[in-house]
């Protein structure tokens, strides 16, 4: 049976509380790859992420483009954000995991020089099986995002592959993502309706 994982990048953002409500209503957990620069202004939201049973992941501090940071600066951004995330877990009264999941901005592409930096730091990179276009300006409609999620989940199920969606609950500019929240709500309702009765 195919397992579906949800992950969200670039938050915490203005839409994160509404997204947490949707996930709570569906009894679903996710991984939130947060930006360090957003954490100071959203400690209550980040603490709720942890208390609600979700995982916090590291999306670096500033969301710099590939090649924009020297190797040492990239490691510093990762380490700084790790420390901020560990502080969020402490605030939530929870133990932080030994290793915090890491996803670099824009993902890790072939020939990406950042791969060598991660290897030296002994850090694994978390990719995805599908990244949705909810980061675009303007974002696709909720139904377009929902349709893309369904198509990918169905294709993976037909191939007996697990799914790891990459969506966005914020942006490096602090944008809201209401279309993402609604698409996730529609998708989780669909999954719940399709689940066999207990």
What are these model-predicted stretches?
Residues 1-73, 80-99:
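Active-site beta->alpha N-cap acidic-glycine motif
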Residues 1-4, 11-18, 44, 114, ...:
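Generic structural signal for short, solvent-exposed loop/turn connectors between secondary structure elements
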Residues 65-192, 196-197:
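Catalytic domains of cell-wall/extracellular-matrix polysaccharide-remodeling enzymes
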């Amino acid at each position: 049976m195919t397992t579906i994982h949800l992950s969200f990048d670039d938050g915490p953002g203005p839409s994160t509380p509404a997204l947490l409500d949707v996930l709570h209503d569906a009894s679903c957990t996710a991984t939130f790859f947060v930006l360090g620069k957003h954490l100071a202004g959203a400690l209550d939201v980040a603490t709720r992420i942890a208390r609600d049973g979700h995982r916090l992941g590291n999306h670096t501090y500033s969301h710099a483009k590939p090649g924009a940071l020297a190797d040492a600066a990239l490691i510093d951004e990762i380490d700084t954000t790790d420390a901020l995330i560990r502080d969020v877990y402490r605030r939530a009264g929870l133990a932080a995991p030994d290793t915090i999941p890491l996803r670099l901005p824009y993902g890790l592409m072939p020939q990406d020089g950042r791969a060598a930096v991660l290897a030296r730091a002994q850090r694994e990179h978390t990719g995805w099986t599908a990244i949705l276009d909810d980061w675009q300006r303007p974002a696709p409609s909720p139904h377009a995002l929902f349709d893309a999620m369904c198509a990918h989940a169905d294709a993976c199920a037909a191939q007996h592959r697990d799914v790891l969606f990459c969506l966005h609950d914020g942006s490096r500019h602090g944008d809201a993502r209401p279309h993402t929240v609604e698409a996730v709500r529609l998708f989780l309702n669909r999954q719940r309706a399709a689940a066999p009765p207990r």
